[in-house]
Amino acid sequence: PPYTITYFPVRGRCEAMRMLLADQDQSWKEEVVTMETWPPLKPSCLFRQLPKFQDGDLTLYQSNAILRHLGRSFGLYGKDQKEAALVDMVNDGVEDLRCKYATLIYTNYEAGKEKYVKELPEHLKPFETLLSQNQGGQAFVVGSQISFADYNLLDLLRIHQVLNPSCLDAFPLLSAYVARLSARPKIKAFLASPEHVNRPINGNGKN
């Protein structure tokens, strides 16, 4: 396969791109980096971080740049410039919440979880609003075709359902959206695969 994902043995910042590739019927290679192999590899990585993504002779770092590249490659970037701008906006919103989530998981889980869960609805509400403004919430987050931001949002919502199983109860459109996208045949197969199931969400065992 032309694609290689180099990353730690977690879902982390790569599960959205893995779902995208699976749903687009692409195969890819996984180069798994362990705590032993990471220190010698780190100096060669552009920003001294992973994931590293290879598409033939193109090497990319930064998970959102990788998602946008795949969005352009597979026509998952809206149907026109206006939709593309909205897709970017949604993806930036996903990134904001993903950063908050990562801070909780890696720096403040025990002390901060209760407050995080309490404030979560206000962070989820914009996505419910976006769905409600697009075909009554029965389609995708932007327009009538799936975009790279949908895969990123789907992953974000699924990991929050693990953190707080009732987090989408107050958001019927988001709840239905997760069920609908998770039922897409290739995503459903990916989510049932041992690769996904056995890969921890985060690197420290907290989720």
Curated annotation (Swiss-Prot):
EC number: 2.5.1.18
Phosphothreonine found at: T59
UniProt catalytic activity: RX + glutathione = an S-substituted glutathione + a halide anion + H(+); prostaglandin J2 + glutathione = prostaglandin J2-S-(R)-glutathione; prostaglandin J2 + glutathione = prostaglandin J2-S-(S)-glutathione; prostaglandin A2 + glutathione = prostaglandin A2-S-(S)-glutathione
Residues engaged in binding glutathione: Y7, R13, W38, K42, Q49, L50, Q62, S63
Function statement: Conjugation of reduced glutathione to a wide number of exogenous and endogenous hydrophobic electrophiles. Involved in the formation of glutathione conjugates of both prostaglandin A2 (PGA2) and prostaglandin J2 (PGJ2). Participates in the formation of novel hepoxilin regioisomers. Negatively regulates CDK5 activity via p25/p35 translocation to prevent neurodegeneration.
Assembly mode: Homodimer. Interacts with CDK5.
Name this polypeptide is given: Glutathione S-transferase P
Designated gene of the protein: GSTP1
